[in-house]
Amino acid sequence: TTGGTATPEGEGLPDASVGYSIFSPPFASLYTYSNSPRDMGNVRDDAELFEHFDFLIAELRRVMKPGRNVSFHCMDMPASKERDGYIGLKDFPGDLLRAFQRHGFIFHAKVTIWKDPVTAMQRTKALGLLHKSVRENSAMCRMGIPDYLITVRNPGEQEDRVTHGAEFPVDLWQKVASPVWMDINPSDTLQFRSAREHDDERHICPLQLDVIRRGVMLWTNPNDIVLSPFMGIG
């Protein structure tokens, strides 16, 4: 397993050498890793984020083995009146997927990771999740925001198939194959550091360890190189 801060680490890897990649990309404005200008989280807006992110996708296209997978963990992003001019949601997962598709990656899989809306309400005080909104103006009410693990496949003929034996029984496969993972512990993550910008909490994208375990278990062979471009922390 290898990790770095986006592209500099990837530039040292040989072509077609990585068996699998899994990470949580920086969410513009809301999440940050460091003060470095090379940190993708340190951007002014979504357009600047994707301009930077494009270089990473190009590197992933180069270093991934043909027929192998890249998984990214993400969520729809809340839009605020102060920052965006309206209250609503932004389709960040769709924007990420389309960015990968522009580089030739193939949309392969998507799983929804359930998150407790009560916990989200207590943490964010989002207008759409407050019970008082049901009474005062329920047109503004919405559901909680889940996480997603979206997987894309590098095109080309696979030279080494990923195979499993008795260690991957049918009951485990049925659990992993579910389109909704209900049993992911949201606090089982690698944490880096916290920071604050105005009154909004800026923290790293919390990719749960069990999500990493399932991706690696399903989509890798022993001794594969697994790349996490953001130090495994996202």
PLM regions: where:
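Core catalytic lobe of class I
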Residues: T1-G234
